[in-house]
């Protein structure tokens, strides 16, 4: 109550921020007359003066913001016949300040971006504008290029259809580059696998504006970008596991101490499968193994777990579709197909086995990064969206981004009606169809939002039966997305769309539709996130247009069934709601929103938790990539580095074979064998007589230095440095890939440390640091072994870089993918444990009833 009084008197924090920006808008408006009286050439000349002031360091962007915004506004009027509204100027300032501008649908975010883009492109360091798909990247770049070109800027577009590094490099070399989040991220990973600086396509990460920032930085935050290569693991286990999974019976979850019946139970809240004691026994019999959870059968146990998930947690046409005999993921937030993306940890193979299509090879990660860490590399990050306030805390804590809600140019007239809740889905479906018929009879356009392809096809079939013409937009026909959405505001149009398919394309209406009440939005169930629901509502009522939105729910909807249906069901029972009747109440709507807040909080904590782990790997990634970039620099003294590594290798090897502290007792036979094997160099025991430990280390280092110099003396200095650089890079890349595998295994098992009263994150940091030290030593020592062992003829020396690049290119062409969401940290490895012995995790349960599941064996870093 007290807070509400304060807000009424002083306004919210957002109100105060907007008020500050409005003061500067008045200053920009005062310049409008000055610039509109200039000719085109005079306007360009004036802009060039400001650009020179930035390049010379005489002024910074904030000093010239008012004039530049006024010039961009005038340029928009002349080239596009579009004038930036006052609220759009505010949006531009918010973006320039490195914040998120929340602007409602139809408020012209594409035009707003031109203001900070031009201002920040003046430094010559480049500006990136990120969109959610190729269509929007190309459209926005083409539409706004008239402004940019007038002011002397070049514009490039990165598209997934472009296969050439040359095309990408040309786009990045432009002053302003548009593209999708995936392409920007993958180009960064690919650049850090190149063997020379000139082959890299990206330049400095200066300033980026992320359009639909909530979709990219929140919804896809748990989805890593992965470049991966094939493994040699057999796929037969997935076929066996699929057959076993089909024979296992699902039971109902019960509260302890009661034991569940059946072979397994499904935990829908955490999207997990729990195999019962009876299920373990049945699986062991069907597989023909004695202990499913022994280390020898660890992979088989994991494959069974994934097969059960595939059959019980993943629905065809909801979570994935079959296209050309391939399993294609459906993005849960947009309803679009995620081409090229595969579920990780064998889940995709389990789905392929379930659907009886060709099972593709498992892959090993070669390079990866999350969007969270990619976009945090930029010197300045900003974003635009129509829906961000519900996630303001996350934007602030994770990205240090403030969210500023920008007032609409014209007040919103859309009516957002309370939810209607029915007992069953069938009652809800019928009510939705009746409402569509009612609106359609008078010509009012209707947009029906569904949560899955399956649901959209249910409504499609019902509308066909009612003979109501309509369009369906889901992942199966997304190619026509823009056209279907553009027509959704026409008289009599009925459009069914999964989630936010068509986001970024405006639905425009004419005066006749305005008279009918505008576009009618019908949501057929609530999403787990209020933000996604708000995005659906936001399709109506753009730029002051009228519109209506309403959600139709049932107690059988997943959100209500899993997270809060009992309370609402009790209310309906008390009110005596009969079949076919609905309840409409603010109390019920608030109960639904509370269920959503509960889920949003769970997801936020999950993303925050995963980021804490990913930050550890990210610091290591940055260190390795920074070192890799140093190696690519022609001025880097690779020879000095090799000499240093030889010295460290010599000290390390000598220490392994010195049997006492004095150094008087050395196992020379084994030492000589090791040096001969690893460095192709003969050493004599006489060379080390009467020397201290340090002197012996130095002596070995000197011998190896001389041997190395003699070996490489037949090569020219330039050729030698090139060989050293490329081989060193290959060792580094291979060691980094092995390290990523080790880190995956570590993360998989670290969660169970909590059972031993240890903080898993602290343990992860400690052990990952030790792994990183091993990685550094491996790079040093393996590079020495490789440089001593290789033999080249002149032709091979000349072609070494080309060959390395060709092999890398093959790898890259066949292995770019998107990982699936990393929702859970996995479980630890166990040595062979008797079935009835206590589980090593410390839970107090028998091993066969608890955590026995294991990932692949942990490799050993050399």
Curated annotation (Swiss-Prot):
Its cofactor is Zn(2+). ATP binds at residues 88, 106-110, 506. It holds the Pfam family SecA_PP_bind. It is a peripheral membrane protein. It catalyses: ATP + H2O + cellular proteinSide 1 = ADP + phosphate + cellular proteinSide 2. Keywords: ATP-binding, Cell inner membrane, Cell membrane, Cytoplasm, Membrane, Metal-binding, Nucleotide-binding, Protein transport, Translocase, Translocation, Transport, Zinc. GO terms for cellular component: cell envelope Sec protein transport complex; cytosol; plasma membrane. Its EC number is 7.4.2.8. May bind 1 zinc ion per subunit. SUPFAM superfamilies: Helical scaffold and wing domains of SecA, P-loop containing nucleoside triphosphate hydrolases, Pre-protein crosslinking domain of SecA. Gene3D superfamilies: Helical scaffold and wing domains of SecA (1.10.3060.10), P-loop containing nucleotide triphosphate hydrolases (3.40.50.300), SecA, preprotein cross-linking domain (3.90.1440.10). Monomer and homodimer. Part of the essential Sec protein translocation apparatus which comprises SecA, SecYEG and auxiliary proteins SecDF-YajC and YidC. Belongs to the SecA family. PANTHER family: CHLOROPLAST PROTEIN-TRANSPORTING ATPASE (PTHR30612:SF0), SECA INNER MEMBRANE COMPONENT OF SEC PROTEIN SECRETION SYSTEM (PTHR30612). This is Protein translocase subunit SecA. It comes from Campylobacter jejuni subsp. jejuni serotype O:6 (strain 81116 / NCTC 11828). The lineage of its organism: Bacteria, Pseudomonadati, Campylobacterota, Epsilonproteobacteria, Campylobacterales.
């Amino acid at each position: 109550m007290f807070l509400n009084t304060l807000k009424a008197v002083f306004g919210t924090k957002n109100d105060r921020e907007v008020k500050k920006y409005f003061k500067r808008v008045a200053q920009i408006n005062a310049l409008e007359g000055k610039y509109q009286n200039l000719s085109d050439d005079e306007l360009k000349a004036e802009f060039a003066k400001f650009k020179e002031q930035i390049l010379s360091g005489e002024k910074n962007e904030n000093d010239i913001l008012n004039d530049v915004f006024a010039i961009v506004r005038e340029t928009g009027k002349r080239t596009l016949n579009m004038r930036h509204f006052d609220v759009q100027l505010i949006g531009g300032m918010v973006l320039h300040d490195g914040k998120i501008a929340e602007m409602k649908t139809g408020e012209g975010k594409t035009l707003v971006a031109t203001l900070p883009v031009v201002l920040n492109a003046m430094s010559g360091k480049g500006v990136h504008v990120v969109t959610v798909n190729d269509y929007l990247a190309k459209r926005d770049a083409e539409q706004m290029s008239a402004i940019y070109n007038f002011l002397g800027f070049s514009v490039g577009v990165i598209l997934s259809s472009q296969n050439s590094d040359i095309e990408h490099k040309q786009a990045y070399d432009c002053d302003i580059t548009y593209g999708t989040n995936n392409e920007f991220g993958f180009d960064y990973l690919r650049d850090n696998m190149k063997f020379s600086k000139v082959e890299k396509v990206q330049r400095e990460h200066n300033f980026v504006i992320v359009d639909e920032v909530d979709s990219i930085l929140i919804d896809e935050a748990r989805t890593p970008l992965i470049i991966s290569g094939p493994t040699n693991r057999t796929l037969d286990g997935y076929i066996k596991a699929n057959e076993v999974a089909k024979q296992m019976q699902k039971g109902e979850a019960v509260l302890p101490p009661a034991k569940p019946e059946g072979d397994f139970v499904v935990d829908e809240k955490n999207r997990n499968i729990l195999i019962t004691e009876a299920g373990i026994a049945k699986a062991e019999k069907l597989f023909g193994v004695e202990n499913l959870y022994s280390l020898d059968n660890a992979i088989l146990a994991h494959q069974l777990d994934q097969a059960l998930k595939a059959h019980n947690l993943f629905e065809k046409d909801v979570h994935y579709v079959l296209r050309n005999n391939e399993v294609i993921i459906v993005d849960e937030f947009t309803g679009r197909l995620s081409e090229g993306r595969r579920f990780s940890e064998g889940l995709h193979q389990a789905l392929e086995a379930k659907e009886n299509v060709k099972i593709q090879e498992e892959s090993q990660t070669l390079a990866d990064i999350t969007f969270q860490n990619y976009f945090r590399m930029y010197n300045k990050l900003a974003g635009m969206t129509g829906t961000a306030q519900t996630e303001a805390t996350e934007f602030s804590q994770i990205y240090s981004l403030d969210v500023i809600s920008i007032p609409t140019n014209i007040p919103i007239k859309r009516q957002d009606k309370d939810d209607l809740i029915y007992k069953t889905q069938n009652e809800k479906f019928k009510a939705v169809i009746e409402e569509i018929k009612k609106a359609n009879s008078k010509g009012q356009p209707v947009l029906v939002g569904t949560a899955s392809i399956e649901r959209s096809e249910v409504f499609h079939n019902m509308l066909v039966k009612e003979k109501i013409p309509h369009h369906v937009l889901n992942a199966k026909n997304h190619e026509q997305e823009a056209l279907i959405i553009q027509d959704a505001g026409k008289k009599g149009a009925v459009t069914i769309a999964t989630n936010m398919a068509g986001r970024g394309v405006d639905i425009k209406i004419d005066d006749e539709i305005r008279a009918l009440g505008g576009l009618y939005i019908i949501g057929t169930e609530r999403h787990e996130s209020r933000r996604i629901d708000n995005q659906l509502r936001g399709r109506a009522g753009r730029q002051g247009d009228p519109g209506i939105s309403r959600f139709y729910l049932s107690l059988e909807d997943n959100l209500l069934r899993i997270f809060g249906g009992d309370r609402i069901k009790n209310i309906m029972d008390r009110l005596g709601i009969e079949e076919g009747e609905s309840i409409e109440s603010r109390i019920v709507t608030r109960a639904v929103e509370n269920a959503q807040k509960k889920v949003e909080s769970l997801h936020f904590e999950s993303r925050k938790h995963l980021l804490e782990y990913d930050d550890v790997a990210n610091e290591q990634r940055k260190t390795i990539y920074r070192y890799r970039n140093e190696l690519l620099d022609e001025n880097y003294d690779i020879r000095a580095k090799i000499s240093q590594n030889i010295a460290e290798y010599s000290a390390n090897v000598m220490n392994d074979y010195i049997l006492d502290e004095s150094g008087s007792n050395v196992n020379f036979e084994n030492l000589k064998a090791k040096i001969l094997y690893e460095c192709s160099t003969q050493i004599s025991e006489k060379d080390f007589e009467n020397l201290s430990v340090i002197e012996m280390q130095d002596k070995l280092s000197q011998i190896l230095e001389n041997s190395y110099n003699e070996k490489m003396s037949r090569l020219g200095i330039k050729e030698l440095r090139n060989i050293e650089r490329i081989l060193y890079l290959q060792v580094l890349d291979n060691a980094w890939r092995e390290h990523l595998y080790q880190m995956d295994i570590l993360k998989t098992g670290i969660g169970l440390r909590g059972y031993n009263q240890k903080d898993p994150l602290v343990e992860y940091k400690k052990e990952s640091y030790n792994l990183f030290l091993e990685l550094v030593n491996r790079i040093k020592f393996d590079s020495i072994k490789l440089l001593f062992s290789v033999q080249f003829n002149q032709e091979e020396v000349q072609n070494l870089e080309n060959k390395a690049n060709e092999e890398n290119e093959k790898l890259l062409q066949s292995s770019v993918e998107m990982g699936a969401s990393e929702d859970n940290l996995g479980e630890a490895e166990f040595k062979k444990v008797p079935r009835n012995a206590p589980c090593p995790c410390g839970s107090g349960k028998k091993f066969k009833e608890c955590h026995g599941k294991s990932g692949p064996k942990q490799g050993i870093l050399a």
